[in-house]
């Protein structure tokens, strides 16, 4: 009897141990599932917060970029309008840049503007007044330089400038291209153009000028590429006006260079006759004064206005 009772106690104790072990395993499994669920939920919340932060950053960057290119569109439209008014309003207005190449000095204006904007960096003021002054300066110097060319040459230069400008911006915004492929594309394009120029039937003077133009514009586009990448990734909102002016000055510099390249009259300009046209105007003015012609004209005009008023 004692043996049977002992066996029963042993069996009951083993059953209790089995139940305790099973309950412990169930509890551990429950805790593990809860921990896994909390880990998954925390990962999901972290992923959702990261996605939302990326979306907010992308929207902010897009808004900044849209402001920059919106101002660039306004600047370009104003410059085109001023040049069109000069060409259409004064079709007979011409300037013999081959005899007096002084207007060609206006092509240095975009270089000076770019130097002022790039070298001063954060110290350069960025407000509406600075924006208006730079836009007016570049627009009127472009209109003055257009006096050395005809309207078809100006339109051709504008189309070529926009083509180069848009192509460079497109390559800069293409994130899927690695830096190696970008450099290879730029170098191969530059070499292809230069080889095509050297293989052409132009004179050596024309070939030299075209090769210099290609190298110069290539350097401008390389700087433009870096500026566009900065605008796309790192530019703060306080530099919107400054960055739009940099793009506008770069576009104007490409246009001036292309216009001078497509104007054959400039190639044979007499640099020893600089400002000779202004000197002739001054001589003619003194001639009118010395001969009393100017006073006669003024007196006649005054008498005419007085008679009309009476």
UniProtKB/Swiss-Prot annotation:
Positions of the UniProt region annotated as Disordered: 1-28
Protein's membrane topology: Multi-pass membrane protein
One GO cellular component term noted in the UniProt record for this chain: membrane
Keyword Hydrolase set for record: no
Transmembrane portions of the chain: 68-88, 101-121, 125-145, 147-167, 185-205, 208-228, 246-266
Sites carrying sugar chains: 291, 299
Compositional bias annotation for Low complexity: 1-13
Cell compartment(s), UniProt: Membrane
Primary location: membrane
Protein keywords: Glycoprotein, Membrane, Transmembrane, Transmembrane helix
Family named by the database record: Belongs to the cytomegalovirus US12 family.
Name this polypeptide is given: Uncharacterized protein HVLF4
Organism: Human cytomegalovirus (strain AD169)
Gene expressing this chain: US14
């Amino acid at each position: 009897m004692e043996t049977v009772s002992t066996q029963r106690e042993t069996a009951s104790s083993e059953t209790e141990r089995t139940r305790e072990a099973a309950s412990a395993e169930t509890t551990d499994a429950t805790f593990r599932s809860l921990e896994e669920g909390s880990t998954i939920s925390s990962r999901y919340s972290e992923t959702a917060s990261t996605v939302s932060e990326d979306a907010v950053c992308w929207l902010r960057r897009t808004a900044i970029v849209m402001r920059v290119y919106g101002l660039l569109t306004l600047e370009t439209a104003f410059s085109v309008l001023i040049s069109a008014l000069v060409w259409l309003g004064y079709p007979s207005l011409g300037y013999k840049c081959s005899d007096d190449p002084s207007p060609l000095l206006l092509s240095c204006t975009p270089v000076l503007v770019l130097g002022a904007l790039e070298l001063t960096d954060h110290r350069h003021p960025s407000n509406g007044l600075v924006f208006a002054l730079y836009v007016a300066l570049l627009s009127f110097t472009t209109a003055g330089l257009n006096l050395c060319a005809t309207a078809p040459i100006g339109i051709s230069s504008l189309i070529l400038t926009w083509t180069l400008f848009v192509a460079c911006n497109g390559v800069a915004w293409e994130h899927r291209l690695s830096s190696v492929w970008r450099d290879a594309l730029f170098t191969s394009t530059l070499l292809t153009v230069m080889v095509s120029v050297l293989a052409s039937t132009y004179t050596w003077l024309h070939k030299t000028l075209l090769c210099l133009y290609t190298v110069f514009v290539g350097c401008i586009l390389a700087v433009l590429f870096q500026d566009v990448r900065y605008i796309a990734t790192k530019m703060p909102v306080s530099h919107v006006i400054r960055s739009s002016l940099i793009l506008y000055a770069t576009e104007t510099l490409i246009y001036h260079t292309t216009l001078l390249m497509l104007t054959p009259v400039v190639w044979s300009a007499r640099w020893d006759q600089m400002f000779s046209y202004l000197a002739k105007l001054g001589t003619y003015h003194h001639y009118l004064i010395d001969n009393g012609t100017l006073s006669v004209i003024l007196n006649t005009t005054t008498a005419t206005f007085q008679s009309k008023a009476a």
